[in-house]
């Protein structure tokens, strides 16, 4: 089955890495459905996808919303072949100061939503005996980071989830993998001062930060036929910041 005849769903597709992934998928001839939490975000998705797909509002903190919206997608006869769990948030704080809400929101969006999104598409993938599930992890899920207990826990949790799901559907033509970025160019990194920037850079053997395009390239590969024998894996894209 050729990738260009597929339909992909990308969460958090209105900006940054999600937008880059969605654009690259659409350039491959894939119909892309992108999610955002705002009306303006949906407009952005519709604008850059044009005839190659569309956007819709989805609140990943709300499990009822996920189930309802995904049911709507299925009723419109869209069968998801490729699921990209890209959306994620941070809410940094030391454990002694971290509120329940800061913990719960990060876990809900970064980990729990991946469970619900994957569950919402897995039956149709099994029926077709074809599917690609690719989730954006983080080097922090392996290294940990001071002030990011919630974020680190959410990204670490993805590892066990994907390995287990990969085992469950390995004989069904479905692959389940993670792309784990290191330090990449985002709107957040633009606000770092010189000291902070150099501190991050000192941890990277390649002595440069990565780009959204480099992360997206790994996602596109895992979504393709060329990666049909790869499952339950984490592809690290971090310039040598973390090596397995």
UniProtKB/Swiss-Prot annotation:
In this chain, substrate is annotated as bound at: 138
CDD domains referenced in this protein's UniProt entry, alphabetically: BKR_SDR_c
* Chain positions recorded as Ca(2+) 1 binding sites: 50, 53
Question: For this protein, what is the EC number?
Answer: 1.1.1.100
**Its domain of life?**
Bacteria
Instruction: Kindly state which keywords UniProt assigns to this record, in alphabetical order.
Output: Calcium, Fatty acid biosynthesis, Fatty acid metabolism, Lipid biosynthesis, Lipid metabolism, Metal-binding, NADP, Oxidoreductase
Pfam families from the UniProt entry: adh_short_C2 (PF13561)
Which residues constitute the catalytic centre?
151 (proton acceptor)
Catalytic reaction equation(s)? a (3R)-hydroxyacyl-[ACP] + NADP(+) = a 3-oxoacyl-[ACP] + NADPH + H(+)
The UniProt annotation places Ca(2+) 2 binding at: 145
* InterPro entries found in the cross-reference section: 3oxo_ACP_reduc (IPR011284), NAD(P)-bd_dom_sf (IPR036291), Sc_DH/Rdtase_CS (IPR020904), SDR (IPR050259), SDR_fam (IPR002347)
Tell me, which GO biological process terms does this entry list?
fatty acid biosynthetic process
Where, in this chain's numbering, is Ca(2+) 3 bound? 233-234
GO molecular function terms noted in the UniProt entry: 3-oxoacyl-[acyl-carrier-protein] reductase (NADPH) activity; metal ion binding; NAD binding
**Annotated residues for binding of NADP(+):** 12-15, 37, 59-60, 86, 151-155, 184
The pathway that the record names for this protein is: Lipid metabolism; fatty acid biosynthesis
Q: Which NCBIfam families match?
A: 3oxo_ACP_reduc, PRK12826.1-2
Miscellaneous field: Calcium ions stabilize the structure, and may inhibit FabG activity by obstructing access to the active site.
Function per UniProt: Catalyzes the NADPH-dependent reduction of beta-ketoacyl-ACP substrates to beta-hydroxyacyl-ACP products, the first reductive step in the elongation cycle of fatty acid biosynthesis.
| Quaternary structure and interacting proteins, as annotated | Homotetramer.
Q: Which family does it belong to?
A: Belongs to the short-chain dehydrogenases/reductases (SDR) family.
**Official protein name in the record:** 3-oxoacyl-[acyl-carrier-protein] reductase FabG
Q: Which organism is it from?
A: Buchnera aphidicola subsp. Schizaphis graminum (strain Sg)
């Amino acid at each position: 089955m050729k990738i260009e005849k597929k339909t992909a769903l990308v969460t958090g597709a209105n900006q940054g890495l999600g937008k880059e992934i969605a654009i690259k998928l659409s350039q491959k001839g894939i119909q892309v459905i992108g999610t955002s939490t705002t009306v303006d975000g949906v407009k952005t998705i519709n604008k850059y996808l044009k005839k190659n797909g569309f956007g819709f509002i989805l609140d990943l903190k709300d499990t009822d919303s996920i189930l309802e919206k995904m049911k709507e997608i299925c009723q419109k006869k869209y069968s998801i072949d490729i699921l990209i769990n890209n959306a994620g948030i941070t809410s940094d704080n030391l454990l002694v100061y971290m509120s329940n809400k800061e913990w719960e929101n990060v876990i809900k969006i970064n980990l729990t939503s991946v469970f619900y999104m994957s569950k919402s598409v897995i039956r149709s993938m099994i029926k077709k005996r074809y599917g690609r599930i690719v989730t954006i992890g983080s080097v922090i899920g392996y290294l940990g980071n001071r002030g990011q207990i919630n974020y680190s826990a959410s990204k670490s949790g993805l590892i066990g989830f994907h390995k287990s799901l990969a085992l469950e559907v390995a004989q069904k033509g479905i692959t389940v993998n993670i792309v784990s970025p290191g330090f990449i160019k985002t709107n957040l990194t633009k606000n770092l001062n010189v000291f902070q920037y150099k501190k991050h850079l000192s941890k990277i053997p390649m002595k440069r930060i990565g780009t959204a395009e480099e992360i997206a390239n790994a996602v596109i590969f895992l979504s393709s036929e060329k990666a049909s024998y790869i499952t339950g894996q984490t592809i690290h894209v971090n310039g040598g910041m973390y090596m397995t």
